[in-house]
């Protein structure tokens, strides 16, 4: 505060390690980060790891629901629009999907708040609702207000990802349906359902997995906008507040965790790629 003396300021700088040069501070940060210690928040005066653990459940639950909606509806609508590509419903869905691709996330959130919260009054416009604490985890899945509060943020965050996955699945499936082995499967007398889902969809998912995996990482990384619009108490809103108050330890910890998360997601995607694509397994077997 303004009433602090110069001695108090210097004492606080020494306590936080800010009196050291950049390289010493950076080394101490990396040393602590490896052990899960990201220092102390300048604003709250509490360990950053403790603050992140408190906020993580909100973001992870929001990301899980958004990701589930994006994958489930994205794949289903992508398959439908590919199979019924000349139908009115498929063309209507593709036209409407342009909204999800074109509109920015914050505008989608504001429109949903205006419609369902302000005009209709069906759903809350901010906050997480009532939560239940299970050990160190807080969840809103077990309360009605928690589930209601989750609907609008989840739709806002997952809509762009859903339309992206849908259009990608449609494009890939149309390409697969033109392949010779699909024509051969139909010539053998297989049912259309078996051709579409057992053969076409399985091969469609191989290239889709890579993009979908990265998009799931983006859901967590870029939940900042959605959490800000809905004042959702997750790590994204924590990061925005840290920027406003120049809380460097919180900012550094958030960016580092997001980077580690993307590396982990890429590893999982590569493993799934190997499990689904038989050509990769055949290449590895042939190499031995």
Region roles according to the model:
Residues 4-36, 182, 231-242:
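Short hydrophobic, aromatic-rich alpha-helical segments embedded in or entering the lipid bilayer
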Residues 19-75:
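An internal, D/E-rich "acidic patch" concept
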Residues 56-89, 105, 133-288:
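Alpha-helical transmembrane segments of integral membrane proteins
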Residues 20, 28-31, 96-127, 149, ...:
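Membrane-water interface segments at the C-terminal ends of transmembrane alpha-helices
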Residues 1-27, 116, 120-143:
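Hydrophobic alpha-helical transmembrane segments of membrane transport/permease proteins
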Residues 1-19, 49, 53, 80, ...:
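N-terminal signal-anchor/first transmembrane alpha helix
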Residues 21, 25, 29, 47, ...:
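Amphipathic alpha-helical recognition patches that constitute DNA-binding helices
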């Amino acid at each position: 505060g303004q009433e602090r003396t110069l001695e108090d300021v210097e004492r606080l700088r020494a306590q936080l390690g800010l009196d050291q040069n950049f390289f010493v501070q950076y080394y101490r940060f990396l040393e602590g980060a490896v052990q899960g210690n990201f220092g102390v928040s300048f604003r709250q005066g509490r360990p950053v790891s403790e603050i992140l653990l408190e906020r993580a459940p909100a973001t992870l639950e929001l990301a899980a629901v958004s990701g589930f909606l994006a994958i489930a509806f994205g794949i289903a609508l992508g398959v439908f629009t590919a199979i019924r590509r000349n139908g009115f419903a498929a063309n209507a869905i593709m036209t409407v999907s342009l909204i999800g691709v074109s509109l920015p996330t914050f505008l989608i959130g504001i429109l949903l708040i205006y419609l369902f919260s302000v005009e209709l009054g069906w759903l809350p416009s901010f906050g997480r609702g009532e939560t239940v604490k299970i050990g160190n985890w807080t969840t809103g899945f077990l309360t009605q207000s928690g589930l209601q509060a989750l609907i609008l943020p989840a739709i806002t965050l997952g809509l762009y990802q859903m339309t992206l996955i849908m259009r990608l699945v449609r494009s890939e499936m149309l390409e697969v349906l033109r392949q010779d082995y699909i024509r051969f499967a139909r010539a053998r007398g297989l049912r259309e359902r078996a051709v579409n889902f057992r053969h076409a969809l399985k091969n469609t998912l191989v290239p889709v997995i890579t993009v979908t995996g990265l998009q799931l990482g983006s859901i967590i990384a870029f939940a900042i906008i959605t959490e800000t619009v809905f004042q959702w108490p997750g790590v994204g809103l924590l990061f925005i507040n840290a920027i406003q108050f120049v809380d460097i330890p919180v900012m550094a910890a958030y960016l580092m965790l997001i980077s580690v998360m993307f590396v982990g997601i890429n590893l999982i995607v590569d493993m799934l790629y190997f499990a689904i694509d038989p050509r990769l397994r055949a290449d590895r077997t042939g190499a031995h």
